């Protein structure tokens, strides 16, 4: 958490799209009319479009009034304005709680708090739901089982809503003292059936536990665990997740759960939601904050839904919190995807909703299958793409006021947000010697900033190029910058960068002319992505920042003059030894050589010592991967040991059968019966000199005569 991205490598092609940017100074329908506490989104896909529900308060969590908004989208990128689906609800005067002695409700509005937002019925009806709780003061809990009740209404295909009904009453409330009727009073029989399906579904009741009456018999597991979600395992059992990475399994569809409920080993998660989902390709993913803070937002993958083996980045940006407030937390948080039964998007990808700083609403699209590494270098002609959604090799960060879009042949980054920026990243195969080229155009040269960074797998930038607001194209070197040239607004430049991790430098060419040579300002082992960003890096908040921000930032709702940048024809290539390798990289298998080197003392050293074994293997051997690790280990051990038998002789390389001297070998300790085996194995080595010289030694080593 020292770094906002956790120094995690992103999965390939994640698109982070902001739906709502809170704005108290300039309220309008696009920002929920100025309410600045926005949080806890829910997601469904039904009848060919996305449905996104979230709750809102004017400024503070648990401080009324409160309401629930709904947005829709055909493609996940363009969204309707928030529409009130559950309006503010008045708490009856005189309402009391045992936990708040001496306090009574007077002209009080309820607080909405729900952990589930949608249900698609067996007959295909879409039901949305919310819950009215009560907070008598800002430190009271609206999810303490002492609320008013849970409400439902139908969302129809034409976008209209049905009437609001209560589906569940908390103690002390019923149809006589509430403002909406009980669902069974509806004359729509299919709607009534849909509501009854919800009540009969234990997996939905598990998501009601926080707001429901304590010890209510309809709740299968009456524990204080929060933010339940679940998915189906390959054998039909149900795996569950709660805050703090608590887990359990049900073998009967959710009616009973294994006890005790335990923390998932290896998962780091604090008091924040964790989302788990079975993906369209049959694998599993969890999306959560892997720290004691609510950043970064990461994804972990599993083949069976039980053992998770990876951790990569989804959203690693934290904007300044523009509006302080009660219980507002920094970071991308409370992720929730599409619950089983609530639809599968047309693209089959993983879509995850969440809030940032509990004020801005976001969604992420994660391509499925989830790719952790780029399989090929960039050769990107944006004119071949019709929509931004087609750029599945690019990671996109697109706020409302700093959008990323396509414009013909150009990938366009705009920015009028003083607190945020547009950002795109192209992940590439990790390269030590890298060539990058692209066309670049700035819409202005008197405002705005565009930074271009070259980063390793941990997000460490080794070098940065920058278009400044003063019309200068410069390169960062340590704490200083080197001005390379002036740039003009509207002019297209062809930029080439040649980077070497061995030499620790970057050479920059513009329109074929070298304009700069700078040392890296941070050493890296390799480069795996190129980033274009319309702003400077952010480091606030830190791990030492106080949890509660009580102030608003000056100008929180104001805009800056629009700056615009365009990039096109992005190409990368590598001069690395394994640059032509599409999938397997030696670094993923180098640990075998390290392990073998440590197994025993090296008492006999020939042409290639153990200290050079890994380097030699990287240069020469074909790579192999298989699920059975002992097979894989044996494969690399064979190459490691073959290398030990390569021997330098006065007539060239030879290959011994035994390391120790044998009485029946020739003068170089070679044995003729093994030559066929040596040739058969050595023909796979990339450098032909070994095989050529081994054969030459046998056939010409004694001037063509028999070896002695």
For each feature predicted by the language model, list its residue ranges.
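Extracellular carbohydrate-recognition regions
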Residues: 1, 370-396
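Secretory/extracellular carbohydrate-interaction modules
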Residues: 412-472
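Short, aromatic/His-centered strand-loop micro-motif at the edge of beta-sheets
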Residues: 218, 474-496
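Extracellular glycan-recognition surfaces and repeat-rich motifs
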Residues: 386-412
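Substrate-binding groove/exosite segments of carbohydrate-active enzymes
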Residues: 34-35, 39, 53, 222-226, ...
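Flexible glycan-contacting loops in extracellular carbohydrate-active proteins
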Residues: 518-565
